[in-house]
Regions:
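A short helix->loop->beta-strand "cap" motif at the edges of active sites that frequently abuts
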Residues: 12, 140-145, 211-213
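Surface-exposed amphipathic alpha-helices with a cationic face
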Residues: 4-9, 67, 71, 137-138, ...
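Glycine/serine-rich anion-binding loops at beta->alpha junctions
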Residues: 52-71
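Asp-based, Mg2+/Mn2+-dependent phosphohydrolase catalytic module
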Residues: 1-44
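A short acidic, helix-capping loop that chelates divalent metal ions and anchors anionic groups
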Residues: 23-27, 85-93, 153-158, 186-190
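Conserved N-terminal subdomain of the carbohydrate kinase-like
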Residues: 45-51, 71-147, 151-154
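Conserved phosphate/ATP/ADP-binding segment of small-molecule kinases
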Residues: 162-232
Length: 233
């Protein structure tokens, strides 16, 4: 009985404990309950982050890269997948988008259980998905939102429609605490050409003035170097 109460206080279903312990061994049940409680307490000490993005089958970008980065920095990572992609280091060969309803289900499931301390948004390829994300983040009063306005894969494959870009500008970017465009994305958002470092500064300044948030302009697509630029007031 004590083990059952301990497990319930920790938020675990009792059946999970019985599955891993001998039904007649109360001491073993207690140890299992204590183990669950200890793991839960350790989890609660960590910061939590939710990544909303596409799945990269090669593991080099998207949900997979976000989760690796979060875990490497001691953050408990959660995810809501916007699309499945078939891709590798040479290009994208297929994209299967989830429905807005299923994305909404994922967001509800995560946020109502383990509230994220931060949210990172990556590839969202359609207007409907962008609107779904915007609606749910407002509903749950999400904070510390990082928007990576993914438009083109590193390999050059286009990942978002023109209409979706406009919706991204009006629905998600105004909610951001930080926007992290690469050079081509910064050119689209700032509506200017970037060739030199001073152009990066000017583009970041324009984006900052439009959306009133920090801008991390990533220089990986630059012809000269891969320096990143952080612009904030």
């Amino acid at each position: 009985i004590h083990a059952v109460r301990t497990a319930k206080k920790a938020g675990f279903q009792v059946v999970g404990i019985y599955d891993e312990a001998s039904k007649d061994d109360q001491e073993e049940i207690q140890r299992e309950a204590d183990c669950y409680c200890r793991d839960w307490r350790e989890l609660m000490k960590k910061k939590t982050a939710l990544t909303i993005a596409g799945s990269d089958s090669s593991g080099g970008a998207g949900i997979q890269a976000d989760i690796k980065t979060m875990q490497a920095n001691g953050v408990y990572a959660m995810s809501a997948i916007t699309a499945l992609t078939a891709q590798n280091t040479t290009g994208v060969t297929g994209i299967m988008e989830v429905s807005p309803e299923f994305l909404e289900n994922q967001l509800d499931a995560v946020i109502t259980d383990i509230r994220p301390d931060a949210v990172k948004i990556g590839m969202v390829s359609s207007e409907k998905l962008i609107k779904t994300i915007s609606k749910k983040l407002k509903e749950y009063h999400a904070e510390n939102i990082v928007v990576d306005p993914v438009m083109v894969a590193t390999s050059g494959s286009r990942l978002i429609s023109e209409n979706a870009i406009e919706t991204l500008k009006t629905q998600l970017l105004p909610m951001a605490s930080v926007i992290t465009p690469n050079i081509p994305e910064a050119e689209v958002l700032a509506e200017m050409e970037i060739r030199l470092e001073k152009d990066m500064v000017e583009a970041a300044k324009k984006i900052n003035e439009m959306y009133h948030c920090a801008v991390l302009c990533k220089g990986g697509h630059s012809l000269n170097d891969a320096n990143d630029l952080l612009y904030q007031n």
